[in-house]
Amino acid sequence: MSTHQYQQLIEIFDNEFFADFNTRLIKGDDEPIYLPADDEAPYNRIVFAHGFYASAIHEISHWCIAGKERRKQVEFGYWYCPDGRDAQTQSEFEVVEIKPQALDWLFCQAAGYPFNVSCDNLDGDFEPDRVKFRRIVHGQVMEYLAQNSIPPRAARFINALQSFYNTPPLTADQFPWPEDPFA
């Protein structure tokens, strides 16, 4: 049995944020989605895909960045371009994924869980440059750490993860420069 179970994230998130933000982390059966409170549920829902731990981490990162008005909208008011993107659309997708994936990496490190950058384009007509994208995300991680600018909810979640998994404080040394495996 893995030491990282999605149920742990649900418990950590609920304990940390439900009372203050009326938001719950929910295991979904399909694609992830954020749903504000409505007639179906009196609380906001961060629905992650298929019980995947990494999906829960990633959806939490988007929630930690979204402002109060965005959190009142389905999917924070953003349009999502599905898998199968061309090079131009993929480039635009990666730009908006830098900060969320930097938080993913910080969350994973705080939980002692391996991080993998996601280009999320398995059915696209070209191969995204994962090393380049990981290096860009790495730069954002370094900026967050150097400038002590991790968004407040993200910092709170990091502290909760560190407490639950008994991991050390985050330092730049824990985030090595992504090497090119083909160089």
Annotated model-derived regions:
Residues 62, 105-108, 138:
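Amphipathic alpha-helical core segments of compact helical bundles
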Residues 2-4, 39-55:
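Short pre-active-site segment immediately N-terminal to the catalytic Zn-binding motif
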Residues 54-67:
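Active-site recognition of the HExxH zinc-binding catalytic motif
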Residues 65-98, 117-127:
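Post-HEXXH active-site segment of zinc metalloproteases
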Residues 107-121:
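Short helix/loop segments within enzyme catalytic domains
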Residues 119-183:
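Pan-zinc metallopeptidase signature
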Residues 94-109:
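An active-site-proximal "capping" alpha-helix that borders the catalytic cofactor pocket
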Residues 1-40, 90-95:
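Auxiliary, metal-adjacent structural segments of Zn-dependent hydrolase domains
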